[in-house]
Amino acid sequence: MKNILVCTIIRNQINNLDRWWHQLHELVAHCPEYNFTFSIFENDSTDGTKEWLVKNLSNQENVVFSSVDIGTRQYGSVWSVDRIKNLAHYRQKCLNQVNINIFNKVAYIEPDIEYDAKWCSELINARHPAQLGIVPDIYSAWALRSLNNPKESAFLYDTCATRQTKDDLVWNFESESKWRRETVQPTDLGGADSNCLHTLYSTFNCFCVYNSEAFKTKSSQSEVKWGYTNKGLNTNQTSFRDHDNNISWLDADTAVICEDFREKGYNKIYINTNCLVRHL
């Protein structure tokens, strides 16, 4: 059996927690070759999330969770320097509270998404890459926008971290069709489950699986940690104000982690356009 760590950071998600936990149980059922451990970091919730976690997860043997009040500001899905720093800190907390050395894979799964566990189990089982003799270092879903905005619901949600090339700062919708044609990998698991594997520069998309080796300390190199940086961004060509009107740019932590993986030699990054998740 292989071991996978599933990480989730949570704040004020009471309306989504039952769905989130139920989907994770379904995911376990579709990944029989893996032992699952769940690492959860919650902070500053005021809507009953803390109480739900204590009631439902306290006695679970395969769950590790922290619940703290640190007084940070809560943001929505916006690009903010402060938010990026906080998210990187929270995601790293999920790794710090376990022994990472016992895991083969690490998955980050957001609490406010909906997905078909049978289809998305591919991200853990990685059968499409296996057809090509590939063990992916990063393998993600394709996240769609909320149905609350029907006109936008067919578009990619994670435009910050999903990038076709190193030079992109966000998702390039204009070249998406070309990207789909040129990056598709020839795999076929039958019927519609084919020609859905693509290469790209970086990704997250609310459900992302990582090679755990990158997070482990080795004698030859230090481990990858969640962080933030201006690395790779030419700010002389970009006038950018964040959500709080600050003139600055910190690249998304979910894009930075991909670049850090690449620098350590973990450069097999894929996305599966059949593994659809819906942001709620």
Pin down the residues of each PLM region.
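C-terminal catalytic/acceptor-binding lobe
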Residues: 189-280
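Short, well-formed alpha-helical segments that are part of the catalytic scaffolds
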Residues: 13-29
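Phosphate/oxyanion-binding active-site loops and adjacent basic polyanion-contact surfaces
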Residues: 13-17, 83-91, 249-254
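Short beta-strand-to-loop acidic/aromatic patch adjacent to the donor-nucleotide binding site
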Residues: 101-114
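A conserved acidic beta->alpha catalytic loop
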Residues: 14, 41-51, 70-72
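Hydrophobic targeting segments
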Residues: 2-8, 24, 36-40
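Conserved catalytic core of nucleotide-sugar-dependent glycosyltransferases
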Residues: 113-230
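Active-site-proximal specificity loops/subdomain of glycosyltransferases
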Residues: 52, 56-103
